[in-house]
């Protein structure tokens, strides 16, 4: 008899068939109260869980007594209580490698669109404001040869540094607990303190995950140390930046502009002051949102779950210590 799993996000048909080759698949659209009775019944027998979003905490896990593995179709896993999973011996799988290049593309797009005011000026053209030769009130700022600072020199940070260094001749600064030899050798990246980085960079690019240590890592004190011409880019997690402090800094000219793919609350409320600021490019958490990458993420998550439930995991496990307990 095949193990039972719960799938709570639509995936391409061929990937669904791959799951069905190994498991009895109970499919749901999200983890909501709309499907609560059927979902609760399926969870009682489920050995595997695959999807994205939703809060997977202690209370949820108590409804899934047979669960052995959870596979998220994402690199981030801050919606999972990792400690609770680990205590129950449940492996948590994620997709850290397949979205690297696409997220780096998104970050570079935010750098360019914020610096050159692409979104704002496109809207002005559509509104009929382009009536003559443009003046300096339509001008942006250069990207090439400007200094980029990267908070989070992991896979995505490295891919962003590659684009900045080779594509735009940008000096690269970064902060980390340990030197990143590959970044320094390939891109001439310079490791420095956060204060030094904030003071020197023209573009502050954040790729950090949300943890207790990174929560509001960039607040009013840090923003005040930046150049008034600096642009902040966040494609990590929204709460890494104190959003109210950022709004104030953008309103009073402490910094020049921001390109944001992530927010404190998502979806971003329509009444957010960020949406009223012309110096903000706000996009709806599209970091990995291409057809190709989202397919690859789902495929990776499927393979991850199969590996976790067949004892063949070699990578992508958030809490690998539970594999040794099995």
UniProtKB/Swiss-Prot annotation:
PROSITE patterns in the cross-refs: D_2_HYDROXYACID_DH_1, D_2_HYDROXYACID_DH_3
GO CC terms, sorted: cytosol; plasma membrane
Catalytic function, reaction form: glycolate + NADP(+) = glyoxylate + NADPH + H(+); (R)-glycerate + NAD(+) = 3-hydroxypyruvate + NADH + H(+); (R)-glycerate + NADP(+) = 3-hydroxypyruvate + NADPH + H(+)
Taxonomic superkingdom: Bacteria
Alphabetized Gene3D superfamilies for the sequence: NAD(P)-binding Rossmann-like Domain
This protein's UniProt keywords: Cytoplasm, NAD, NADP, Oxidoreductase
Primary location group: cytoplasm
Enzyme class per UniProt: oxidoreductase
GO molecular function list: glyoxylate reductase (NADPH) activity; hydroxypyruvate reductase (NADH) activity; hydroxypyruvate reductase (NADPH) activity; NAD binding
Active site, UniProt feature: 237, 266, 285
EC numbers, comma separated: 1.1.1.79, 1.1.1.81
UniProt-annotated location(s): Cytoplasm
Listed InterPro entries: D-isomer_2-hydroxyacid_DH, D-isomer_2_OHA_DH_cat_dom, D-isomer_DH_CS, D-isomer_DH_CS1, D-isomer_DH_NAD-bd, Glyo/OHPyrv_Rdtase_B, NAD(P)-bd_dom_sf
Transmembrane regions listed in the UniProt entry: none
Subunit details: Homodimer.
Protein family according to the UniProt entry: Belongs to the D-isomer specific 2-hydroxyacid dehydrogenase family. GhrB subfamily.
Function summary: Catalyzes the NADPH-dependent reduction of glyoxylate and hydroxypyruvate into glycolate and glycerate, respectively.
Protein name as catalogued: Glyoxylate/hydroxypyruvate reductase B
Organism encoding this protein: Yersinia enterocolitica serotype O:8 / biotype 1B (strain NCTC 13174 / 8081)
Phylogenetic placement of the source organism: Bacteria, Pseudomonadati, Pseudomonadota, Gammaproteobacteria, Enterobacterales
